[in-house]
Regions:
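Hydrophobic anchor at the start of a short beta-strand
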Residues: 3, 20, 24-26, 62, ...
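Glycine-rich FAD pyrophosphate-binding loop
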Residues: 6-8, 18-42
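Conserved Rossmann-like nucleotide-cofactor binding loop
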Residues: 11, 34, 145
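N-terminal glycine-rich dinucleotide-binding loop that anchors FAD/FMN and/or NAD(P) in oxidoreductases
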Residues: 41-64
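Central beta-strand plus flanking loop segment that forms part of the substrate or channel wall
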Residues: 49, 147-179, 184-187, 195-197, ...
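Conserved N-terminal helical subregion
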Residues: 53-57, 66-152, 156-165
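FAD/FMN-dependent oxidoreductases across multiple families
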Residues: 209-245
Length: 245
């Protein structure tokens, strides 16, 4: 059995690994490199213990590249006391950098004989592939190709009218296993450990309250109770929205 996947993204890479382990051949087609989304090195992903077990079943050992989180502390604005906390000696979840997980899965796939990938040069190539009898099944996880425009008319779009700011801080080495979220007046600010000396920052705020990079850094310094910050990485920002077709 052969399956065709459209889109070079984390979803399709993990799906490819699962399918191949089940004895199914995969051919991944994606837009040319200059059309692929730029890699965001600040982006992180949270994985539950069940997620980790599932991935390990398909030879994807995320624990080697992720940070185990065993505590979660929640604070209200300037309060020094938590209003809610979770503690588990084993682990509550893992945090891993998105690009590290992407690279890890992709390197494994490149070694598999049942995995192939090709560039798509123009829109008409998508339609030609759909007519080919080589594949028993097609999966499309690209949101901006002709397949969505031609076949999916009931797209669900949701604009949350909010902006997220993300960055990573370098700090002193410590046992960094506690995720912290502070509900500031502007919006939630999260400290998400990604190693013993690096922590990811995520701040979400209504678009009407947008801030600049320096204001974001000052906000982090104001609410930081845990780290001796050495430096910030580039501060990225993006609009929060949801798209389903």
């Amino acid at each position: 059995m052969k399956i065709c996947l459209f889109g070079k993204n984390l979803t399709n890479l993990i799906l490819s690994q699962v399918l191949i382990k089940k004895g199914i051949s995969v051919h991944l087609y994606h837009q040319k490199k200059n059309k692929l989304a730029k890699i965001n090195y600040n982006r992180t992903i949270g994985l539950s213990f069940e997620n980790i077990k599932f991935l390990k079943k398909y030879d994807l050992d995320v624990e080697k590249i992720g940070q185990k989180i065993s505590k979660i502390f929640l604070y209200k604005n300037d309060s020094k006391e938590t209003f809610l906390k979770f503690d588990n000696k084993n682990s509550l979840f893992f945090i891993v950098k998105n690009h590290l997980l992407f690279d890890s899965v992709y390197k494994k796939l490149k070694k598999r004989k049942d995995f192939k990938e090709s560039n798509i040069k123009k829109d008409s190539d998508y339609l030609k592939l759909l007519k080919k009898k080589d594949f028993q099944f097609f999966v499309n996880s690209e949101t901006n190709n002709i397949i969505n425009k031609k076949f999916f008319f009931q797209n669900i779009k949701k604009d949350y009218k909010s902006t997220s700011y993300i960055s990573v801080i370098d700090h002193q080495k410590l046992k960094n296993n506690t995720s912290v979220q502070i509900f500031t007046k502007g919006g939630p600010l999260a400290f998400l450990p990604i190693s013993n000396s690096k922590t990811s920052l995520v701040y979400s705020v209504n678009n009407k309250l947008e801030i600049n990079e320096n204001e974001f850094k000052e906000l982090v310094k104001k609410y930081n109770k845990f780290y001796k910050i050495k430096k910030f990485s580039k501060v990225d920002k993006f609009k929060l929205n949801f798209f389903l077709s």
